Design a protein with these regions (language model features):
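N-terminal cap/lid segment of alpha/beta-hydrolase-fold proteins
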Residues: 1-31, 83, 158-163, 187-191
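Short amphipathic alpha-helix adjacent to the substrate-entry channel of hydrolases
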Residues: 30, 49-67
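Short beta-strand element of the alpha/beta-hydrolase
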Residues: 32-41
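A fold-wide structural signal in alpha/beta-hydrolase
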Residues: 35, 60-70, 108
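Catalytic nucleophile-loop/oxyanion-hole region of alpha/beta-hydrolase
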Residues: 48-49, 69-104
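Primarily recognizes the serine-hydrolase "nucleophile elbow" in alpha/beta-hydrolase
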Residues: 88-166, 173-178, 182
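Acidic catalytic loop of the alpha/beta-hydrolase fold
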Residues: 156-157, 200-203
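Short beta-strand/loop motif that positions the catalytic acidic residue
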Residues: 189, 194-197, 201
Length: 203
């Protein structure tokens, strides 16, 4: 395994956990691997350590190339900054897919809690014109995840929202709350999704 640290923006860093090239694995390494970008939770106030290395190593052991995103958090979590960070990460992984031996059509996002909200946000807002402009691309397909794994995610900004998470990423105006109520944004262009919760999660 080799690890690379890749600055994305003023407040965001992408850490890559990549399979090392070796004589024993060279034939296997010639095959492109799927990849996954992990977004830890933390209420958009911090990125939780417990949702970083453990899932990263698990996915790496499954044969994936793995990336962990430290995205912009409060007080820099407004104005779609975390979403832009994740979109930039997706764009970077796609653009360097040959170098990193990644199948550019098999790049998933995985998020935990508020990180699940972030991952799902890219799943429904990957073609947001403002985010595309900030990423310097007119090709929305570069930013679209091929699949999503949402782990006990924050989803709604409506009546039953996780208040501290949504307060850090959204304003109180109706337009903003509707934008971040992801259950209302699902369409036929939303990527295939595996979503799971636990019965003991009171949030």
């Amino acid at each position: 395994m080799r690890v690379e640290t890749l600055p994305l923006s003023e407040h965001a860093v992408l850490t890559a956990y990549l399979h090392s090239d070796s004589p024993d694995l060279r034939a296997l390494e010639a095959v492109s691997r799927p990849a996954i970008i992990i977004c830890p939770g933390g209420r958009y106030a911090f990125c939780a350590d417990v949702e970083r290395d453990v899932p990263a190593i698990s996915f790496l052991n499954m044969g994936l190339q793995v990336f962990v995103l430290d995205y912009s958090v409060e007080p820099f979590a407004g104005d779609k900054r975390p979403l832009t960070d994740l979109a930039l990460a997706m764009k970077l992984v796609r653009e360097r897919s040959v170098e990193w031996q990644i199948d550019a059509h098999k790049i998933a996002v995985c998020g935990f809690s508020a990180g699940g909200h972030l991952a799902a946000s890219l799943g429904v807002h990957w073609n947001d014109s403002q985010v595309m402009s900030r990423c310097g691309t007119a090709d929305a397909a570069l930013l679209r995840p091929d699949a999503m794994v949402l782990c006990y995610p924050v989803i709604t900004a409506g009546e039953y929202r996780h208040k501290s998470s949504i307060a850090n990423v959204s304003s109180d105006c109706e337009e903003s709350l509707n934008y971040w109520s992801l259950e209302t944004q699902v369409s036929t262009s939303t990527p295939p999704t595996f979503l799971w919760h636990t019965m003991t999660d009171k949030t």
